[in-house]
Every structure is written in C-alpha cells, then in structure tokens.
Design a protein with these regions (language model features):
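The conserved phosphate-sensing helix
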Residues: 21
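ABC-type ATPase nucleotide-binding domains, specifically the catalytic core motifs of the NBD
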Residues: 29-37, 51
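ABC-family ATPase nucleotide-binding domain "signature/switch" substructure
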Residues: 7-16, 24-27, 41-49, 61-154
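Short basic coil micro-motifs at the edges of alpha-helical modules that engage polyanionic partners
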Residues: 32, 53, 68-70
Length: 154
C-alpha cells in the first residue's frame, strides 16, 4: 500500500490544531477537497460547530485568522473534528484531541467524536483514563516500548 493510499484511510485529530488563514468553510473542506458546501456544513453540524459559527460576522465564511487564533482552542479542535468527519476515513486517530478543551467544549467534542467514530476503527492517544474508558482494548506504551495490552471490559 502506498503512503498516499494509507493516508486516504486515516483521519487524524491532533492535540494542537492548525487552521489556515482562509475561511472556516475552506478549513473544514481540507478534509475532502471535492466536498460540496452542503457537505461541509453537515460536517460542521455533526462536529458541534454551528453554535459558534453562527455568532461570527460572516458565519462559516469568516476568516480563521493567522493559525486560527480568532477561535478558542476548543473551537479549533471542533473545526478539526469537522474535517475528520468530512473525510470519513475508516481509521480515526485522536491524539489528545480534547486536551485543551474546557468542560463545555469537552462535552460538545465528545458528542462530535461519537459522531465521527461510528463504524470506524479508533485509535486514541491519551494520558487521562476517562478519555479511554469506552475502549475495547487498551495498549500501554512508554517511550516507544509496548508494555501491555488488555481489555477493560468484563
């Protein structure tokens, strides 16, 4: 499998989000460049973005600003989740995706993540136990060494 083929099968949501200095619509569309505006809006809805997007002067057409600094960390993370929802890849990697979220944003992100991972393979990189409590399998890795793997369900 080529690197490009592998990349097409993985959605990655990182702890630190980067937004481009273009519209929020185009930032979400980075998940799938040929997506229609309607598909981008649907991904934004599923990612719980509409509440803050509707408050912006130009809505989803507002500019993200340099590195997305006009948005809070939790809002940037939800834009990144919208990208991943739009991409609809069969494998989703969440790398500390809720690390910077305040309680309100974390709740909305959890709803967005539930939407994102339906019928998908999910890999969660986390330091907090609550982030992985619903996992089928937990793998403990320390300094690139696989320490153990087990199920927490009984």
């Amino acid at each position: 499998m080529s690197l490009e083929a592998l990349n097409s099968r993985i959605s990655y949501v990182a702890q630190d989000q980067y937004l481009f200095n273009t519209s929020l619509l185009e930032n979400i569309r980075m998940g799938r460049l040929n997506a229609t505006d309607e598909e981008v809006l649907e991904a934004a809805r599923k990612a719980q973005c509409m509440e803050f997007l509707e408050k912006l002067p130009q809505g989803i057409h507002s500019m993200a600003g340099d590195a997305g600094k006009m948005l809070s960390g939790g809002q940037r993370q939800r834009i990144s989740l919208a990208r991943a929802i739009l991409k609809d890849a069969p494998i989703v990697v969440l790398d500390e995706a809720t690390a910077y979220a305040d309680p309100e944003n974390e709740e909305k992100m959890e709803a967005a993540i539930a939407e994102l991972v339906k019928d998908k393979t999910l890999v969660v990189i986390a330091h907090k136990l609550p982030a992985i409590m619903n996992a089928d399998q937990i793998c403990v890795v320390d300094t690139a060494n696989w320490l153990r793997q087990e199920s927490i369900r009984t």
